[in-house]
Amino acid sequence: QITLAAHKRMDIIVGALLMLGEATVYNKDAAITSGQTNNKLLEITLPFNFIKPKSGDVVVDGKNMFISYLREKLHSLAPDYGVYAKMIMTRASFNKLILGSSEFGEQYKMILGSNEMKLSTGLVSSSLASEVFTGIGLPRIEIKEDYVKDQTGKNVQIYADNRITLLPSDQIGYMRHHTPYEATDPVQGRTYIPSEGQMLISNYRDKNGRYMEYTAEWIPQISNPDLITNFDLSEIASIQSA
């Protein structure tokens, strides 16, 4: 029997909150039998500034001008939302939306300097792209590539594609935790080992095998969610891949 460790479950929730502005916690047993469609225990939504551009906002004269669109949009948002420290996205989104922009190679060769050869061969890294972005006043890029095997046994991509989230600072927020009930009233015969964030780990066995159980009462607190901007780029991505 395998139970999803608390920190892995929280990785899924925090990733969903950052990229979608919402996350759902399901009952473990019901999730296995229903494919995570029933018995929602908790739904969290955050008041992000959501923006969903259409193809006409980005495509100009048949060219993908996403970088220019992003610059202009962030400039208009600055008086109300401030200057963003970084933008997070998946590798697929980076390749499709940033490197796939027509203007990346056409307009920013001067900034690339000695790295221009990397552009011509398609070997542009996220760190190199970040140099270009910070050089033109955009936030630096942070690529997110993480997977977790959920309680149904399926690998889950933590961070959603076709989304870009802009964060005011590197400090995303805090993980609030509470003393688990088992800490004061343990199950008879069980031994609990305390871990970070007041998490309890219990190892035991019976005639059917060995078990490891995690007990934690956590909830993420995202700092200043009303100042976070999230771009939903699904319409643009679908047009590009068509």
Show which residues each predicted segment covers.
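A generic, well-ordered mixed alpha/beta core segment in the N-terminal half of proteins
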Residues: 1-6
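Histidine (H) residue identity feature
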Residues: 7, 75, 177-178
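An acidic- and aromatic-residue-enriched active-site/binding cleft used to recognize and process polar
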Residues: 7, 18, 92
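Intrinsically disordered or highly flexible coil/loop and linker segments, enriched in small
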Residues: 8-15, 83
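Short, glycine/acidic-rich hinge or "gate" loops at secondary-structure transitions
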Residues: 12-30
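A broad, structure-centric signal for solvent-exposed, well-ordered loop/edge residues
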Residues: 25-26, 96, 150
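Extended, solvent-exposed, turn-rich assembly/linker loops in the middle of proteins
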Residues: 29-120
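Sequence/fold signature of self-assembling virion shell proteins
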Residues: 42-53, 57-62, 103-242
